[in-house]
Design a protein with these regions (language model features):
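Conserved functional hotspots at enzyme active or ligand-binding sites that engage polyanionic ligands
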Residues: 1-115
């Protein structure tokens, strides 16, 4: 299996989940660096066709018009660490650097202090 790289979209089953976590078989965007991913885990953001709550809160990046076959919203407010091999993930495609840079910028606002 290929080592996932930042900017890859993989199809993976996110179950089991709890509460408001995205669930089920869905595309995810890999946001962690390949050197980290070689350790067996990846940080991903789920992609959804819904996600209105994330969009209105400013934590979603659209794939519409990006040139990718995968469409929907990257939910930057739900980063998650997963083992893609254990979850039998499958590589789908790679997004443009513009898309993954926009996702990383949204993630940065979550983890940086405003003060």
């Amino acid at each position: 299996m290929k080592t996932p790289a930042r900017g890859d979209i993989w199809l993976v089953n996110l179950n089991p989940t709890l509460g408001k976590e995205q669930q089920g078989l869905r595309p995810v965007l890999v946001v962690s660096e390949q050197a980290f991913n070689r350790l067996g885990l990846c940080v991903v953001c789920p992609i959804t066709q819904g996600g209105q709550e994330s969009r209105f809160a400013g934590f979603a990046v659209t794939l519409m018009g990006s040139g990718s076959e995968t469409q929907g919203l990257v939910m930057c407010n739900q980063p998650r660490t997963v083992d893609l091999m254990a979850r039998t993930g499958r590589f789908v495609e790679k997004v443009t650097s513009h898309v993954h840079n926009e996702v990383l910028a949204k993630l940065q606002t979550i983890f940086e202090s405003g003060s």
